[in-house]
Amino acid sequence: MKLIVGLGNYGSQYEATRHNAGWIALDQLIEKYGFTQQKNEHNSIIFFSTVNNEKVLFVKPQTYMNNSGIAIQAIMHYYKIEIKDLVILHDEKDFPVGKNQFKMNGSAAGHNGIKSVIQYLGTQNFNRYRIGIGQPEQGWKIIDWVLSKFKPEELENIILASKSISNFVNDWTKGTTFQNIMNLYN
């Protein structure tokens, strides 16, 4: 079983914001692969799918960004998912919009959602897909920047970039290692 989690904040006021880039990318995967069932459990919306005979859970935590680790830990425990079978999709302010990258592990680098995941999983060794949202424009505070909405052309760029890597789920469920996913898609 594979677990793909998009980090974000719930509520209409957060739709299309930079901090919800993980949810935007996850929506593209759900659209491509579909789902057979949807549940609200473990402080999350879980979309159940099957790709190449492998069960895949697409998850949107409903804990707000800074507490995402609570939901992810609960899901991993309940469904007995190993850390190697987890990918977190999240915004990355150190990349310009349009630059995205798979990564196998590392620190939170100031990202409070990732900090929560590290805290609750007890490790920073998990797979990620970092989605560039750009640095704050001059005069912006970081918190205001990440909670600001994408410009229309930026949002389109995020959606196109997410669609372009969506085949990683197909490769991953066929047994391609995450190292090879990085080599193929980065």
From Swiss-Prot:
Marked site: Discriminates between blocked and unblocked aminoacyl-tRNA: 9
Site positions for Stabilizes the basic form of H active site to accept a proton: 91
GO cellular component: cytoplasm
Localization per Swiss-Prot or TrEMBL: Cytoplasm
A Pfam entry, by short name: Pept_tRNA_hydro
Reaction equations catalysed: an N-acyl-L-alpha-aminoacyl-tRNA + H2O = an N-acyl-L-amino acid + a tRNA + H(+)
GO annotation terms (biological process): protein quality control for misfolded or incompletely synthesized proteins; rescue of stalled ribosome
Active site: 19 (proton acceptor)
Record's keyword terms, sorted: Cytoplasm, Hydrolase, RNA-binding, tRNA-binding
Broad class of the protein's primary localization: cytoplasm
Enzyme nomenclature, EC number: 3.1.1.29
Binding site for tRNA: 14, 64, 66, 112
GO molecular function, one term: tRNA binding
Signal peptide annotation: none
Subunit and partners: Monomer.
Reported function: Hydrolyzes ribosome-free peptidyl-tRNAs (with 1 or more amino acids incorporated), which drop off the ribosome during protein synthesis, or as a result of ribosome stalling.
Family: Belongs to the PTH family.
Name of the protein in question: Peptidyl-tRNA hydrolase
Source organism: Mesoplasma florum (strain ATCC 33453 / NBRC 100688 / NCTC 11704 / L1)
Phylogenetic classification of the source organism: Bacteria, Bacillati, Mycoplasmatota, Mollicutes, Entomoplasmatales
